[in-house]
């Protein structure tokens, strides 16, 4: 079973995809196509709280609210993508959950204002915009969405099916866009996943009745408590070498787009919190901000999966390379990544980057060369893309990392296996 939506796998999957933040735009397009046809289908989009803060989602919300499109948006708020969500929008949603009582007491505000001696009746008759500015001090839940022209319902228990059905039916009866804000728990229903949602985000699916996991080929394993620890991989060596360099070079800063654990930068964050930046699911912003940091004298390192780096193509070309800034782009999970599904392959980034002037591109043959390339990249005054796979490392004997010459290749003879075809 594919790890993300796949139309050939299920009639309930209407779109092939696995990248966060695209749903609102796709849903808007489906709803607009429905309106052009003059039909009456119901269009609903489920978007996570982490995906909501991506640039594409905000662009879509702007258009949806402007056009008043009849569309149901379900905001699935579990405070996580793979790692916990970050940023001002995440803080806003948390504040909304803390002020649930607002809607229950909202009707009392006009009565309170109207009862003020002498000037009460005048206050009660003021314009809607002025009254909104007064009562905004109470932190009205969903005010952000309401101001964009999207009706807000929430916060509701996303695990309460009758409540969900009632809310959805009410939302579908409304004429314009509606957002239903639901609170959920990641991994709900499977205790190990509830206890460790980050690890279980990409774990093999367990057989729930016996608690046994299978590997990619369907071979049953032992009873699952947590996924087995993985062997050391290129990501861990990249992160470890970055930590070593950062200890002596205070210009080095690390940036991730919502994936500190997946890119190994969680260790950098623990060691140097003042030099670590998780910008959320916002790859374009991550790369553009890195350009600014480099222009300001820093040595920024942006670690992003190859598949997600595609989203920041213009920033690599226009911001980093056109300005010839010393940004190190750690292209994690480069190449074929079979178990990550069709939407998460890393085979396109290398071909695309080879067309760009001024960027240096390298890929290590083993973990020791990776360590050397990290240091080599940070010693350059030009953009540097370091591609490395998801794979486990080769077990090459440790050696002191040295700066490598740019443009030189190593000719390694390989023994060909006998083949009968």
Features from the language model and the residues they span:
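Cofactor-binding active-site loop characterized by glycine-rich and histidine/acidic residues
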Residues: 1-67, 252, 256-257, 265-266
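Short, small-residue-biased leader/transition segments that mark boundaries at the very start
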Residues: 2-3, 417-421
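A short, small-residue-rich loop immediately preceding and capping a beta-strand
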Residues: 13-16, 39-54, 71-74, 252-255, ...
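Short acidic, glycine/serine/threonine-rich loops at helix termini
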Residues: 52-61, 82-88, 93-94, 165-167, ...
